[in-house]
From Swiss-Prot:
It comes from Arabidopsis thaliana (Mouse-ear cress). SMART domains: BPI1, BPI2. One of its GO terms (molecular function) is lipid binding. This is Putative BPI/LBP family protein At3g20270. Residues 1-59 form the signal peptide. GO terms for cellular component: extracellular space. InterPro entries: Bactericidal_perm-incr_a/b_dom, BPI/LBP, BPI/LBP_pln, Lipid-bd_serum_glycop_C, Lipid-bd_serum_glycop_N. Transmembrane segments: none annotated.
C-alpha cells in the first residue's frame, strides 16, 4: 500500500507544492503565491498589493523579498473598475440625513419644509482613472451622475388655520467628482495606509416634485438645492473614510506566516515599502519556508532588483528558486522525505518474483517473498531554475526489504543521484504538473545477498524510478491543484515563464459576470 508521502491538507502555494512534491516533500497545499492572490481578491484594493515585478533575469536577494508582485497598467485598470463597481454595489442605497428649512414664498409667506427618507439609489460613472505617483495611489471618478429619492412635506400656518401636505420627489445629481488618495507603507512586515485623503464635489442637481403647485417646486429648489448638494458631498466623503479605515484594518490583519503542516510554515511578511512606478504597483514578500514554531524575521528592506516587463498580463508573480530550496531544506531537516511502497501503481503486491530477471540474487535467496521498498532522501534536494525550466537533483537511497517467516528483513540498499525536470500547465483553473527523469546514476551501497552486477543495479533503479516512483508522483500532480480564486473571479490568458533563478506566473483576471 502506498503510504502517505505528501500530506496535502490545504489548497495554496501551487508552485511550491508541485516542485516539492517532485522532491519527495511531505506537505500540504499551502500557497505562498496564490494565497496572496486570494486575499487580494477578497478585498479589492489589495489587488494593488498582490502583483509581481518581473525580469528576464531574477537577481538573488539575501534580506529582501523572494516573491515579488506587480500590477501592470491593465491590472490597475481592472482594479479600478472593480473597485468602483464594488463600492457602489456595497454602499447603495445610501441613506442621507433629513433636512428641514423655512422658506419665504411670495404672496404666501413663510413655509416650513422638510425632506426625509433621502437616499442615493443609483450612481452612474461616466469616466474614471487611477494614477500612481510618489505620494500615493490616486483614484478619480469624473462627471458621475446619481439618482436620489426622498419624501417632502410642508406646513403653512396662518392666524386661524394650518395647511400641510406631503409627497415624494426625485433628484438627479450631475457632475459628481470623487478623488481618493492613499499611501501604502511597510509597518513591521505588514502593510499600512499611512495617509488617505478624499474629496467629493457636485456641480448641480435637478429636482422633480411629484404633485404640488409651481410655488412648491420653486420653494423646494430655493430652500434645499445647496443643502442637498452639501449633504451628498459630506455623506459620500464620510462613507469613503469608513471604507478606507476598514481596508487599513484588513491590511494590517493579514497573517505574517501561514502554517503548512506540523513541519513548516511560510514567512508572509512584506519587505520594504511598495514601489509606485509609472502606472504600476510593486511589492515584495519574504516568501521563504521556515520550521513551524520559529519566530518570524522581518526584513527591513525590499529586494534591490527591479524587473523589466516580459509580457502584458495584468498580474505577474515571480518566485525565486531560493523559495523552493528553502522548502526542501525545511522538510529534509524535519525528516519527512521518506516513502514506503508495498504495492505497484495498479495495486498488486510487490514480490521478489517481479525482480528475478533484474535482480536474480534477490529472487534466488527469497523466491516469491513479499517485499517493501523504502526510499529516503539523504540530503536536501537542490533546485535549479533556468530559462529551460525547473530541474532538481535528488540523492535517494532505496532499501529492499523482504518478508521472511513473518519478519521484515533489510537485504540490500542502493544509492542513486537522479536529475528530474518538472513541467507545468494550467487546465480549468487547476495547476497540473508532471515529472520527467532526465538522468540518474546508481550504485550498490550494501548487500546481504552478495554483490549486484552494475548493469543489474542500473536496471533495477531505472525500473523503480520509471515504474514506481515517477508514476506515483505524477498521479498526485495530475489530480490538479485548484487555484484559490473566489467565485466572483476567473483567471485567464495564463502563461508560465521560466527565467534564470526564478519562475513567473503571468495572468489576466476577470469576473465571472463578464465572460
Amino acid at each position: 500500500m502506498y503510504n502517505s508521502w505528501f500530506v496535502l491538507k490545504q489548497k495554496s502555494n501551487i508552485l511550491l507544492t508541485i516542485l516539492t512534491s517532485s522532491l519527495l516533500a511531505k506537505f500540504s497545499y499551502p500557497s505562498t503565491l496564490f494565497f496572496f492572490l486570494e486575499m487580494a481578491l477578497m478585498k479589492v484594493m489589495t489587488i494593488l498589493v498582490l502583483f509581481v515585478s518581473v525580469s528576464s533575469t531574477l537577481a538573488q536577494s539575501n534580506n529582501g523579498g523572494h516573491i515579488s508582485i506587480i500590477v501592470s497598467e491593465t491590472g490597475l485598470e481592472f482594479a479600478k473598475d472593480y473597485l468602483i463597481k464594488k463600492v457602489i454595489t456595497t454602499t447603495l442605497p445610501l441613506q442621507l440625513p433629513d433636512i428641514e428649512n423655512k422658506v419665504k414664498i411670495p404672496l404666501i409667506g413663510k413655509v416650513r419644509m422638510g425632506l426625509s427618507n433621502i437616499q442615493i439609489d443609483a450612481v452612474h460613472v461616466q469616466s474614471s482613472k487611477m494614477e500612481t505617483r510618489k505620494d500615493g495611489i490616486i483614484l478619480s471618478v469624473l462627471g458621475a451622475t446619481a439618482n436620489l429619492s426622498m419624501d417632502w412635506s410642508y406646513t403653512y400656518r396662518a392666524s386661524f388655520f394650518e395647511i400641510s401636505d406631503h409627497g415624494d420627489a426625485s433628484v438627479e445629481v450631475k457632475g459628481m467628482n470623487v478623488r481618493i488618495t492613499a499611501t501604502l507603507v511597510n509597518d513591521n512586515g505588514s502593510l499600512k495606509i499611512a495617509s488617505r485623503e478624499n474629496d467629493c464635489t457636485v456641480k448641480n442637481i435637478d429636482i422633480h416634485i411629484n404633485g404640488g403647485a409651481s410655488w412648491l417646486y420653486q420653494g423646494v429648489v430655493d430652500a434645499f438645492q445647496k443643502m442637498i448638494i452639501s449633504t451628498v458631498e459630506k455623506t459620500v466623503s464620510t462613507k469613503i473614510v469608513e471604507k478606507m479605515k476598514k481596508l487599513d484594518s484588513f491590511l494590517q490583519s493579514l497573517p505574517k506566516q501561514r502554517k503548512i503542516d506540523d513541519s513548516a510554515a511560510v514567512n508572509l511578511t512584506f519587505t520594504g515599502n511598495p514601489v509606485l512606478g509609472n502606472s504600476s504597483v510593486e511589492v515584495d514578500i519574504n516568501g521563504l519556508f521556515m520550521p513551524k514554531g520559529d519566530d518570524i524575521k522581518v526584513a527591513g528592506s525590499r529586494s534591490s532588483s527591479f524587473f523589466g516587463g516580459v509580457n502584458k498580463r495584468m498580474v505577474t508573480i515571480s518566485v525565486e528558486e531560493g523559495v523552493f530550496n528553502s522548502a526542501t531544506l525545511v522538510y529534509f531537516n524535519a525528516k519527512v522525505m521518506h516513502l514506503v511502497m508495498e504495492e505497484t501503481k495498479n495495486g498488486s503486491i510487490l514480490s521478489t518474483s517481479d525482480w528475478k530477471l533484474i535482480l536474480p540474487e534477490l529472487y534466488k535467496h527469497y523466491p516469491d517473498n513479499k517485499m517493501v521498498l523504502n526510499m529516503s532522501v539523504t540530503s536536501p534536494p537542490a533546485v535549479k531554475i533556468t530559462e529551460n525550466g525547473i530541474d532538481a537533483t535528488i540523492q535517494l537511497d532505496i532499501a529492499f526489504d523482504v518478508q521472511d517467516s513473518g519478519e521484515n528483513l533489510s537485504v540490500a540498499r542502493l544509492s542513486t543521484i537522479l536529475s528530474v525536470a518538472c513541467s507545468t500547465e494550467i487546465v480549468k483553473n487547476n495547476l497540473i504538473g508532471s515529472l520527467r527523469l532526465n538522468d540518474f546514476n546508481a550504485t550498490m551501497k550494501w548487500s546481504k545477498i552478495g554483490e549486484f552486477q552494475t548493469n543489474y543495479v542500473q536496471a533495477a533503479t531505472s525500473r523503480i524510478l520509471e515504474a514506481l516512483f515517477l508514476p506515483y508522483v505524477n498521479t498526485r500532480l495530475k489530480r490538479g491543484f485548484p487555484l484559490p480564486i473566489p467565485g466572483d473571479f476567473t483567471i485567464k490568458n495564463i502563461k508560465i515563464v521560466y527565467v534564470n533563478s526564478g519562475i513567473l506566473v503571468c495572468t489576466d483576471i476577470g469576473t465571472s459576470t463578464n465572460q
